[in-house]
Amino acid sequence: MKALIILGLVLLSVTVQGKIFERCELARTLKKLGLDGYKGVSLANWVCLAKWESGYNTEATNYNPGDESTDYGIFQINSRYWCNNGKTPGAVDACHISCSALLQNNIADAVACAKRVVSDPQGIRAWVAWRNHCQNRDVSQYVKGCGV
């Protein structure tokens, strides 16, 4: 009985960690989910974006004190405009999704919301990390050797 209690406590103390994708694994997943060429954005640009926004980490979050919003998940999708975290003042929730859904290891919801973001007039330029690290650069290295 004592061993079962200890085992239960050990299992409760295990923290759930987000998935950190390997570069080519992410490229294959994004391609499978329809991002390659979506709204004219190459797969290499999406992988570059994810690298610089989250380090390929599905559980990445970043609080923005200026507007009290938070960026979520592999694409760092913002709670001010795109998802609902129940805390951001004046949030729009244009993706009609809970921000916590953007932190899942299965990135289908994050991809669906990213498709919504890139469909706006600003397109992929909505992401600062893409503008700073991927725009007007050779991003082919992000899919090199991935067979995609």
Curated annotation (Swiss-Prot):
The keyword Nucleus does not apply. It catalyses: Hydrolysis of (1->4)-beta-linkages between N-acetylmuramic acid and N-acetyl-D-glucosamine residues in a peptidoglycan and between N-acetyl-D-glucosamine residues in chitodextrins. GO terms for biological process: defense response to Gram-negative bacterium; defense response to Gram-positive bacterium; killing of cells of another organism. Residues 1-18 form the signal peptide. GO terms for cellular component: extracellular region. The active site is at E53, D71. CDD domains: LYZ_C. GO terms for molecular function: lysozyme activity. Residues 19-148 form the C-type lysozyme domain. Its EC number is 3.2.1.17. Lysozyme C is capable of both hydrolysis and transglycosylation; it also shows a slight esterase activity. It acts rapidly on both peptide-substituted and unsubstituted peptidoglycan, and slowly on chitin oligosaccharides. Belongs to the glycosyl hydrolase 22 family. This is Lysozyme C. It comes from Nasalis larvatus (Proboscis monkey). The gene is LYZ.
